Amino acid sequence: DFFFKKASFISRIGSGSACRSLYGGINFWGSHSDFAFSSDLYSTQISDNVSAEYNNFRDVILIIDDSKKEVSSSVGHELMNNNPFSDVRFKKANNNISKLMNILKSGDLNEFCKLVESEALMLHALMMSSNPSYILMKPATLLVIDKIRQFRINSKIPVCFTLDAGANVHVLFPEKLSEEVMVFIREELSLFCINQNYISDFVGSGPLQI
């Protein structure tokens, strides 16, 4: 455990995403008053009190734009220092962590979808309201978001989207529903991708010590 904790600590300096990818399954990074195990210095694996619904999740990344990122993650973080909504965002994120932990325990996929999408859109809203401001989404991003929401309503399948700091869309859904969702992705969503390209990923077991 010390090896991975140290690896998470070191990788945090270069990448927050790497920091919270040292373990398989669900990882928690960031200090929170409700969770004694939490830390800003390294991530922690969460395995207790997590519904089996989240054991085998898929992530399909739709390549809407394959050009270089308009703004780096470090620059994006700096913009939050003077953003007029940053304090509200920090409080909201803190509350959402508590909500998420309850959702992970209950296995409520509908509430999971609502929270994930809210977080994604809030990130982009902050970038649009910063100074200088950035619109990271492309027109196709919004069309895909609308398609996913309509599909969820019509099919009653708990599939949702999240966004990175760019135009690409991550489609999240349980592995057990992959047959129906992958048909939707291939036949409809891939049409919005560069050369119909997308990356099909899944929850892994994390890196190995060598």
What is the meaning of each model-derived region?
Residues D1-N56:
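Gly/Ser-rich oxyanion-binding loop with an adjacent helix/lid
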Residues N49-I210:
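C-terminal nucleotide
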